[in-house]
A protein has these predicted regions:
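A glycine- and charged-residue-rich anion-binding loop/surface
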Residues: 1-260
Length: 260
């Protein structure tokens, strides 16, 4: 049985402008309310009552293994917490503790400490994956990943269990990358151009939908299709630790990562 959708009868609206791609460190913004929809689905945070659609937003919607942003939206007549952010088609839906009127101009503010930790962990997953590939061999492939506020996990394909020494070497190389690579490179390419230029290794995290592909490149260390939010400068992560690993199934190791 399919899960009940978050909202019923979504109106036809222009795609939400993703300010989180234009400036990943932007924490405040002004926007116009295009729709205010009562939430009716099953997977709704306790206290959230309405899904707010804006013309633009800094709030990153859950996707690609990265949790959605939290924060606050307010206008002259109301102020509501945002308890999660989701994507519905081309629209970003802010799950709010109350309603606004269509046409309201609102001020949005991110829960920045949460977003920063999510960025720490998401960028760290890419760096650790690249380090594992360089040290263990080109057979290393991302089989899955999850990034939360407190930690991240990365599932990689490998033919034997990883020792603590293996983990220490991967961790050491990952921290070298943080120190030595000054900037990450983010680009959007047409899918055919991306395939031609970089090959199908781009899609280790899964092939994204649409004709345009957003790509994260960390020097010659790692390059992947990824729609998440990432630090412009790897050094902002601070430090990466690989806490432990365990076997998820034959030939797949799960690395437990803490960054920041």
């Amino acid at each position: 049985v399919a899960a009940k959708p978050l909202v019923d009868n979504i109106p036809t609206l222009p795609a939400t402008v993703p300010l989180y791609y234009e400036d990943v460190s932007q924490q405040n913004f002004e926007a116009s309310v295009l729709a205010c929809l009562e939430l009716s689905g099953e997977d709704i945070p306790e206290g959230a009552t309405h899904g707010i659609v804006l013309d633009r937003t800094c709030f990153y919607p859950e996707g690609g293994g990265q949790e959605g942003d939290y924060g606050n939206l307010r206008c002259d007549s109301a102020s509501h917490s945002i308890l999660d952010t989701r994507k519905v088609g081309d629209l970003v839906l802010h799950l709010a503790t109350g309603s606004f009127e269509v046409g309201d101009m609102v001020h949005g503010e991110l829960d920045w400490s949460r977003r920063r930790q999510l960025m720490d962990h998401h960028t760290a997953v890419h760096i650790v994956g690249g380090a594992a590939r360089r040290l263990l061999g080109p057979h290393i492939y991302q089989a899955g990943a999850n990034k939360s506020v407190d930690s991240a996990r990365l599932d990689i394909t490998h033919h034997k269990r990883l020792s603590r020494q293996d983990l220490d070497e991967i961790e050491s190389l990952a921290n070298e990358v943080i120190q030595n690579v000054s900037r990450t490179e983010k680009m959007t390419l047409d899918r055919k151009d991306a395939d031609r230029k970089y090959g199908f290794d781009l899609y280790q995290g899964g092939a994204p939908k649409g004709s345009d592909i957003r790509i994260l490149r960390i020097a010659d260390h790692d390059i992947q299709a990824c729609g998440g939010t990432h630090h412009d400068e790897p050094g902002r992560i601070g430090q990466i630790r690989i806490v432990r690993s365990n076997a998820v199934q034959d030939g797949v190791e799960r690395l437990h990562i803490v960054a920041g």
